[in-house]
Amino acid sequence: MSNPMENPMKKSLLAAGLAVALVSGSALAQMKPETMVKQRQAVMTLQGKYWGPMAGMMQGKVPYDAKIVQRNAGFLDNLSRMPWDGFDGATKDVKSAALPAVFTDTAKFAEAADRLQNEASKLYAVSRSGDEAAVKAQMGAVGKSCGGCHESFRQKN
């Protein structure tokens, strides 16, 4: 099994995540609400970028590629932990697709965030197994967790 730290892309993503974690406490206290919204939207955009090809594979629209799945699942696993501090109460009046329930039903929103993180972690773990059927089943669980959160907490376009 290869060392994940040997992969420069994984190193970069880990370093970026660590940097965000280290400065998030003090930086968020000073960060403008508009910037926090942009930060969470950027993370969600990246989640979509890495989820899209996997969703296509799950639906049979794109040929299954285990290498891409494993790489994208790893990115999604990391990204699934990043947007939540950008939903600070200070952002509730900033124009975005977030519904008021994000800020009024915080326990349910936290459960939805945890569900995505757990399902993304499981996807990354199963992606390393090489079991295409298991991977596709877990992709379904990730998609369901994304959709569940969007259904309850995101305005429909």
Where on the chain are the PLM-derived regions?
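Bacterial N-terminal signal peptides that target proteins for export
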Residues: 3-15
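Active-site-proximal loop/hinge segments that shape catalytic or ion-binding/gating pockets
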Residues: 17, 21
